[in-house]
Amino acid sequence: MLKRQLHSASKRSATRFSDALNKGPSFDDFLTGRAGKAAAVDPVLAASSDGKRLPKWLKTEIPKGKNLHNIREDLRGLGLHTVCEEARCPNIGECWGGSDKSKATATIMLMGDTCTRGCRFCSVKTNRNPGPLDPNEPENTAVAISKWGLGYVVLTTVDRDDLSDGGSWHFADTVKRIKEKAPHILVETLSGDFRGNLDHVTTLAESGLDVFAHNMETVEALTPFVRDRRATFQQSLSVLRQAKVAVPDLITKTSIMLGFGETDEQVEDTLMQLRGVGVDIVTFGQYMRPTIRHLKVAEYVTPEKFDYWQKRAMDMGFLYCASGPLVRSSYKAGEVFIENVLKKRNAAKAV
């Protein structure tokens, strides 16, 4: 009798989970060319796509500035892509628009602009077979970055499950070439999970980079609803753990979006698990629905709540935490802090 009840309860739970996924967007919904009537919605500059009034703390000015224009033109000329533009980041004016180019930060997206996965929060294009890698991309990227005179650059990629190594060699080669041409530039990589292959994680971690980042995105309980089914919470945790195993003094970093309906207990548990694998830096930002095909925003989290999580993370021993409605994984204020930490470390090694 008890066995039958447990089986029945398990079946109901599985059915509810399947129903929830079926009601949400599927992988096919994100495939390139299948957008249909789902027009893009700017996550900050337009009204909320969920029918909710956008809180005042999420409104920002239209990005502008000569430096922003110059960096955009440089990218076009070299055929490079940035996640800043692909993901319509609200901080692009802050990161690109300053008068001092050496203070500017840019997040370059490698291996094309089309991902093999279809996460339910992400606006990047999706296709099962994005096409071959550009063999000239590592060199072109290194040349462009060294010419710009940027002090800190973030390299990220779309997921490339179609490649045997997930693109890890291509990624690592880009880092090495940048360091050869401009060793003073600090390089942060924001990688995918390489399908959990720890050898591929090690390839990237040992490339000479300064910061290894991989985003958890959300709490464990919501991961199957928010991310592509090939991405799991524990798999992502193992990626961050392996980066530290490969290079113990490497700074590791992750990012979490709030507003999916997570509970405080779930966020607390996530922070504890991250500290358990030695993650140094965590960022919190508000999830914004990029198009009507994507998950709805469950909650607009208040600035006060973001402040709470910033303090909680620091109390738990994280080296740094950037937390705010408009904070994104590659956030300029966080990069300035990391840059100072790395410079102090390098100076200490030189003594």
Curated annotation (Swiss-Prot):
Residues noted as binding [4Fe-4S] cluster 1 in the record, renumbered to the chain: 84, 89, 95, 330
GO terms of biological process kind: lipoate biosynthetic process
Annotated binding of [4Fe-4S] cluster 2, by residue: 115, 119, 122
Record-level Gene Ontology MF annotations: 4 iron, 4 sulfur cluster binding; lipoate synthase activity; metal ion binding
Family annotation (InterPro entries): Aldolase_TIM, Elp3/MiaA/NifB-like_rSAM, LIAS_N, Lipoyl_synth, rSAM
Cofactor binding description: Binds 2 [4Fe-4S] clusters per subunit. One cluster is coordinated with 3 cysteines and an exchangeable S-adenosyl-L-methionine.
Keyword Cytoplasm attributed: no
Pfam annotation, one family: LIAS_N
GO CC annotation terms, alphabetical: mitochondrion
Main location: mitochondrion
Domain Radical SAM core: 100-319
Pathway the protein takes part in: Protein modification; protein lipoylation via endogenous pathway; protein N(6)-(lipoyl)lysine from octanoyl-[acyl-carrier-protein]: step 2/2
PROSITE patterns listed in its UniProt record: RADICAL_SAM
Origin superkingdom: Eukaryota
Compartment(s) where it occurs, according to its Swiss-Prot or TrEMBL record: Mitochondrion
Cofactor or coenzyme needed: [4Fe-4S] cluster
Keyword 4Fe-4S: yes
Catalytic reaction equation(s): [[Fe-S] cluster scaffold protein carrying a second [4Fe-4S](2+) cluster] + N(6)-octanoyl-L-lysyl-[protein] + 2 oxidized [2Fe-2S]-[ferredoxin] + 2 S-adenosyl-L-methionine + 4 H(+) = [[Fe-S] cluster scaffold protein] + N(6)-[(R)-dihydrolipoyl]-L-lysyl-[protein] + 4 Fe(3+) + 2 hydrogen sulfide + 2 5'-deoxyadenosine + 2 L-methionine + 2 reduced [2Fe-2S]-[ferredoxin]
NCBIfam families listed in its UniProt record: lipA (TIGR00510), PRK05481.1 (NF004019), PRK12928.1 (NF009544)
Family that this chain belongs to: Belongs to the radical SAM superfamily. Lipoyl synthase family.
This protein's name: Lipoyl synthase, mitochondrial
Protein species of origin: Yarrowia lipolytica (strain CLIB 122 / E 150) (Yeast)
